[in-house]
């Protein structure tokens, strides 16, 4: 996501939770420093005074990727104990776009109720599920589909996956 946004010259503000950092080291070949270098600005998740914790800080929206069920629950219940949860709460109260890339499976009734609660507030629940009509060949193809779906929500042009209806898939 950050690589694509940097290429497109989109300003980004990165908040990485402790578990987000663990995901990066366990699931990718990237270093934390490399990921931080992709963002315009970074903030520590414990810094509740960061600019993004205030509604006066103008942003187009927020993407939480990946979004754990713990973070989903915190946001759904207004428990702003981290900068991620606080910033998400601010994004909701300021009526800005919030996208949660949840990836837990299977989902419990509690998870679904929290998602429904947030969806009713206008939060976009966008699990990184690929569309197989795109005929993904690599993990990057699958990742790019999820990234592209997020960018679509912000009307950011990209060519990360083939659109339905082009000559490749009709």
Q: Model-derived features: where do they sit?
A:
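A cross-family phosphate/adenosyl-ligand binding-site feature
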Residues: 1-99, 105-170
């Amino acid at each position: 996501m950050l690589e694509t946004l940097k290429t497109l010259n989109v300003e980004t503000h990165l908040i990485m939770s402790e578990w987000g950092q663990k995901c990066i080291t366990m699931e990718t070949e990237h270093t934390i420093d490399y990921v931080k270098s992709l963002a315009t600005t970074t903030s520590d998740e414990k810094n509740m005074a960061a600019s993004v914790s205030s509604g006066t800080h103008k942003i187009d929206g927020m993407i939480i990727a990946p979004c754990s069920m713990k973070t989903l629950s915190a946001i759904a219940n207004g428990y702003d104990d981290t900068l991620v949860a606080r910033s998400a709460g601010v994004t909701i109260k300021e009526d800005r776009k919030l996208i949660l890339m949840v990836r837990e499976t299977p989902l419990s009734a509690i998870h679904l109720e929290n998602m429904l609660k947030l969806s009713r507030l206008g939060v976009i629940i966008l699990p990184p599920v690929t569309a197989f009509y795109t005929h993904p060949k690599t993990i990057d193809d699958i990742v790019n589909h999820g990234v592209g779906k997020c960018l679509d929500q912000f009307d950011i042009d990209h060519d990360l996956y083939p659109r339905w209806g082009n000559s490749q898939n009709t």
